[in-house]
Amino acid sequence: MGIMGPRGPPGASGAPGPQGFQGQTGPAGARGPPGPPGKAGEDGHPGKPGRPGERGVVGPQGARGFPGTPGIPGFKGIRGHNGIDGIKGQPGAPGVKGTPGQAGARGIPGERGRVGAPGPAGARGSDGSVGPVGPAGPIGSAGPPGFPGAPGPKGEIGPVGNPGPAGPAGPRGEVGIPGISGPVGPKGAAGIPGVAGAPGIPGPRGIPGPAGAAGATGARGIVGEPGPAGSKGESGNKGEPGSVGAQGPPGPSGEEGKRTGPAGPPGIRGSPGSRGIPGADGRAGVMGPAGSRGASGPAGVRPGEPGIMGPRGFPGSPGNVGPAGKGIPGIDGRPGPVGPAGARGEPGNIGFPGPKGDKGHAGIAGARGAPGPDGNGEQGPAGPPGFQGIPGPAGTAGEAGKPGERGIPGEFGIPGPAGPRGERGPPGESGAAGPAGPIGSRGPSGPPGPDGNKGEPGVIGAPGTAGPSGPSGIPGERGAAGIPGGKGEKGETGIRGEIGNPGRDGARGAPGAVGAPGPAGANGDRGEAGPAGPAGPAGPRGSPGERGEVGPAGPNGFAGPAGAAGQPGAKGERGAKGPKGENGPVGPTGPVGSAGPSGPNGPPGPAGGRTGFPGAAGRTGPPGPSGITGPPGPPGAAGKEGVRGPRGDQGPVGRAGFAGEKGPSGEPGGTPGPQGIIGAPGIIGIPGSRGERGIPGVAGSIGEPGPIGIAGPPGARGPPGAVGAPGVNGAPGETGRDGNPGNDGPPGRHKGERGYPGNAGPVGAVGAPGPHGPVGPTGKHGNRGEPGPVGSVGPVGAVGPRGPSGPQGIRGDKGEPGDKGPRGIPGIKGHNGIQGIPGIAGQHGDQGAPGSVGPAGPRGPAGPTGPVGKDGRSGQPGTVGPAGVRGSQGSQGPAGPPGPPGPPGPPGPS
């Protein structure tokens, strides 16, 4: 069995893809205008308030961007054939590990769940505006009790306004290109490490050099996902024994090199990565649960005429985009469909030359294999791997070759565990406003809200006479904004929208400077041989071998009796393999030669090379220079709570309905009549006590002003209705125009409680990053986080922009050719078989089995990498989500003091 070649050096790790962008948040839908007030109903018994509109289901969180495509695994070196007496071929240099694909862009968040249309407002009888107090009239005799009036018709619901244009979403801060992890050392400033140099050419024997001293630690790069393990190649057929070459003198020992290249100074922050393809919109949310029915409202008055619909309000200006909140990580959405591949980017600039590499020591020749049997035998099991040679000093990096063309992308590998979550960067600047998306469709009606608590009935005053209409009152002060509401349950994932076009290429960053090399480390201990691997599967049938020559004719035997022609016998089993011959003597060690000039970098070796055992860790190098503090990184992924949008301005106050005419006074204490239909909202009544601060809902878009109702004749003040339970505050709408001033009502008896302080105003656009502060002391390395769960294989992301080329290595001197290995001992010739008794001349034997395929030649050099495709254009903004949840009406204030008793009313209808 041949000597197993040393393992080749490991392939270079691909740089992790940049983090995908977070998709734009869909704008909130506009709040629909309130319907016109319905006709006021006659004095009836308190009707139950209308069910509040459902609360819209919160849209699903945007789908998470596609994970970066795992890098193409390095080619596995070709395993040497088990040629009898043949020296096992050197393993090829490992293939360069492909750079991981660019991380998929974070998908655009799905549409916000459609807001349920508010339930029809119960036609609440409007409270008549209180006229000026007249002089107390004489107490009249009570008239006959009137029957309850017929319930008024239900007021029509005004059409839901179209949502206003969405505020432009600022683009995300551009993502910098992550650097490759530098060697371990004191942690320098958070600079981007330089790119890794091209892998050096394996030495003559491929013996890995000892580990060099670790340089100063640069900023910790993002950990790329490991590529999948390459599949094990099929074992080749057993080759015919080759002739053993003559033993040559061993090559000279090379100078001790360094396993790791010099640590470069922290690189300048690279150009921002291109914008990823936005993900699809989420699916529409599900309808929320039905609320319970509200408590009975106050008594309605006689139905009035339907109000005239007011003019449509102008949409307000969209609020500024607030800063990104530091929320908890969001739940990963389903990956969107694969976006189109971006255009190829421009090739990067060639980096600065690297230091010259030293030549490694020549490896010790392996023992000669034992002779094998003659003929083409079946392939035996693979022997145990040979001992690793004494590691010679690693050669310094040679001249970096020009980038080859981009190879065909390999198959997707199984994604490795997720790396630790990086620190959240500062928020990026607000970008230019994008075009407004189309208006979302109206969502379905939601279930009714819960019943409000029924308040205590107010004191019923004596019916007063209808006074003349008072002058219009001045608008009341705006109540304090409610406290933020709790986060609603997460809705189902919305329908995924279309994928936008790819983004444009970012600018290319300048290459980093080359750092000084660290000291060389000591040689590591020689590793022990590993256990023998399992026998590989049988290889393909080889090509026919050369036809053997006819041997000399044997002596004529005695003619035997002619036997009957028998049937061809079964093929006998193949004999056992002969014993392995002893290893030949090891040739003398040649003199140590002087280090020859390092040769240029050769093409990548064939796939299948084994990686040599790592050398011992070198001494820690001196601390590297502090890196240049890079600009603020891109903002981190949105948390679970999401970024709170800007607080919308308060929606317009709709014109209050007009007061209905005063109906006939009923006898106090009469039996309650049937439940009346809730009347339309009345005009603005007496300012009640200030309600408690409600929970602000989701910020709605600009609402449209409600229709201006026609002011009707003032009606008598009805009995105060029961105070309903505080409704769920909806999202504050945009600030609308001031409504018409209402009539001045009498002051309330109780002063309302002071409301909670209002929410902060809209957050302005994020300013430009400030100047860089002084570099702080070097922090300690944090613990590496536990690997995250293995994510599902995402679709192929768009090809990212080409990173800056690595430093151009100095071309090394060509090394001297190594000495030829010792010639193996010729195999023992097999014995001639014993001549059998001559019989009848047999038939010609079958042609011998084809000879085994010779050892595969080295893999050709990889083609030059083609230019990286440019990213496509930025995708169109997603569709505008439906309107936000309409907030329910606040709780009614306490009733004012009863008016003076009026004269008795006429008898009611029978």
From Swiss-Prot:
It is found in: Secreted; Secreted, Extracellular space; Secreted, Extracellular space, Extracellular matrix. Prolines at the third position of the tripeptide repeating unit (G-X-Y) are hydroxylated in some or all of the chains. Residues 10-31, 115-144, 169-184, 208-223, 266-280, 289-300, 362-371, 427-444, 460-475, 501-523, 550-570, 583-598, 674-743, 756-769, 786-807 have a biased composition (Low complexity). Keywords: Calcium, Collagen, Extracellular matrix, Hydroxylation, Repeat, Secreted. Residues 40-54, 571-580, 811-822 have a biased composition (Basic and acidic residues). It comes from the Eukaryota. Transmembrane segments: none annotated. Residues 1-184, 200-910 are annotated as: Disordered. One of its GO terms (cellular component) is extracellular space. Its main location: secreted. Type I collagen is a member of group I collagen (fibrillar forming collagen). Trimers of one alpha 2(I) and two alpha 1(I) chains. Interacts (via C-terminus) with TMEM131 (via PapD-L domain); the interaction is direct and is involved in assembly and TRAPPIII ER-to-Golgi transport complex-dependent secretion of collagen. PANTHER family: COLLAGEN ALPHA, COLLAGEN TRIPLE HELIX REPEAT. Belongs to the fibrillar collagen family. This is Collagen alpha-2(I) chain.
